[in-house]
Amino acid sequence: MKNLAFWKSVFLTKSIITCAEGAALFFADSWIRNLLNAQPLFNVEYSQLFFGLVFFIGVAYWWVANDISNNHGIIKFGICAQSFVFAILAYHTAIGTIHPLYLIPGIIDLIFAILYSVFLFLYSYKQAEPALE
């Protein structure tokens, strides 16, 4: 498949974004909520678990960037997870339970879910082509 360097940079970029987002929210969620005049969460431990998982999903994207041909299960998981994050954030933004700025990470996730889908489509298409002799 051509452009593997481009796709590696896509997965590496998302890895950095996701790890940074998970770490930042893990340590600064209450500060961010105060800044946005948003209500604090009742169960901080659940959000900390989620933010920790977000960080480790970023690590998984790093694994993908370093071995694109063998980590398609992680890519499929990423498509599902990122689409779900967007759907939840869009819903809660629409009904007014979260500040609209919280939708920005959801939009970023949706963009990467689309990019991941394009990658899988192109990769499977290129693998299905018969070898020319």
Language-model-derived ranges and their functions:
Residues K2-F6, N66-H72, I98:
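Membrane-interface helix-boundary motifs at transmembrane edges
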Residues I16-F26, F42-N66, F77-A87:
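Core segments of alpha-helical transmembrane spans in multipass integral membrane proteins
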Residues I75-L89, P105-Y116:
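Hydrophobic alpha-helical segments of small multi-pass membrane proteins
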Residues I32, A60-G73, T93-A94:
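Juxtamembrane helix-break-helix junctions at the cytosolic face
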Residues S69, A87-I104, F121:
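Membrane-helix boundary connector in multi-pass membrane proteins
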Residues I111-E133:
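Membrane-water interface at the C-terminal end of transmembrane alpha helices
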Residues S30-L41:
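Membrane-interface helix termini and inter-helical loops of multi-pass transporters
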Residues M1-I17:
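Cytosolic juxtamembrane helix and N-cap/initiation of the first transmembrane helix
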